[in-house]
């Protein structure tokens, strides 16, 4: 797929598929894509926003409608799937979270399904939606997998980080949270600076590792799909099907890991020392 009608070489093709649709504000107006190269931090990846919010709304609508139509008799396939997800995540939350908080199970379910749906977009053929958007809407760049955008995974993990800090302060108080940062692992006033550095690094590493793990796995998977798409048609079929089947495991596993680590981190935040 080319942005101006000419064929792209392999390097340009890869770069094209790894470029987000951007929007920014310049000189009081709105600019897109290449015009946003110097906009810096204030650049919106509108494709990531569109697909992540859209998939979040789809998740809420789907589960809400299923709940409205739930019957006591023989459930349909969709109701069975929703009930399996809800009951499974609820069981995991009860086994992994050792405090008392009614928010944890719904939060874990939301994270798992939302991240799973965003990851699932990676199974759509790499040229299918971008080519349609370019041909019919004139959109030259489009990344359809939100979790291949570090901004999305960092946004998710920073939200978890805020909850970790909030519940740590709520459970221990400001004084207890401060002591946790300054008097562990060495309980002596002279080692407060060392403790603070060690505990701060440990705390900050949680959202960073969450974000990079999810981003790295999905970005690598998307890159492999792009490389397969550059091959002859017979090689594409021979390689894309096995990789897609294997990638289903990665999609589910990464959503599960993100959910589990969120539960574990919040459980640790509720513990009183």
Curated annotation (Swiss-Prot):
Localization of this protein: Cell inner membrane
PROSITE patterns: ATPASE_A
A Pfam match: ATP-synt_A
Keyword list, A-Z: ATP synthesis, Cell inner membrane, Cell membrane, CF(0), Hydrogen ion transport, Ion transport, Membrane, Transmembrane, Transmembrane helix, Transport
Membrane topology: Multi-pass membrane protein
Its job: Key component of the proton channel; it plays a direct role in the translocation of protons across the membrane.
Protein name per its UniProtKB record: ATP synthase subunit a
The species this protein was found in: Shewanella sp. (strain W3-18-1)
Protein encoded by which gene: atpB
């Amino acid at each position: 797929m080319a942005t101006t009608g000419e064929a792209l070489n392999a390097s340009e093709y890869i770069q094209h598929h790894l470029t987000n649709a951007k929007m920014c504000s310049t000189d009081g107006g709105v600019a897109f894509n290449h015009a946003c190269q110097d906009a810096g931090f204030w650049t919106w990846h509108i494709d990531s926003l569109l697909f992540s919010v859209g998939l979040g709304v789809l998740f809420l609508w789907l589960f809400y409608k299923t709940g409205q139509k739930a019957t006591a008799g023989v459930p349909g396939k969709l109701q069975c799937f929703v009930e399996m997800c809800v009951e499974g995540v609820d069981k995991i939350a009860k086994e992994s979270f050792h405090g008392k908080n009614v928010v944890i199970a719904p939060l874990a379910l939301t994270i798992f399904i939302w991240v799973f749906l965003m990851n699932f977009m990676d199974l759509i053929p790499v040229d299918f939606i971008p080519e349609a958007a370019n041909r019919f809407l004139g959109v030259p760049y489009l990344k359809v997998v939100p979790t291949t955008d570090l901004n999305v995974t960092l946004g998710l993990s920073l939200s978890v980080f805020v909850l970790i800090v909030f519940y740590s302060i709520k459970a221990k108080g400001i004084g207890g949270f401060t002591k946790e940062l300054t008097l562990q692992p060495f309980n002596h006033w002279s080692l407060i600076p060392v403790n603070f550095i060690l505990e701060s690094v440990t705390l900050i590493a949680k959202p960073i590792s969450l974000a990079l793990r999810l981003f790295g796995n999905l970005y690598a998977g998307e890159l492999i799909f792009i490389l397969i798409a550059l091959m002859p048609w017979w090689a594409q079929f021979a390689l894309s099907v096995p990789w897609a089947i294997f990638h289903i495991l990665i999609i589910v596993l990464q959503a599960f890991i993100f959910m589990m680590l969120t539960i574990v981190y919040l459980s640790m935040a509720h513990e009183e020392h």
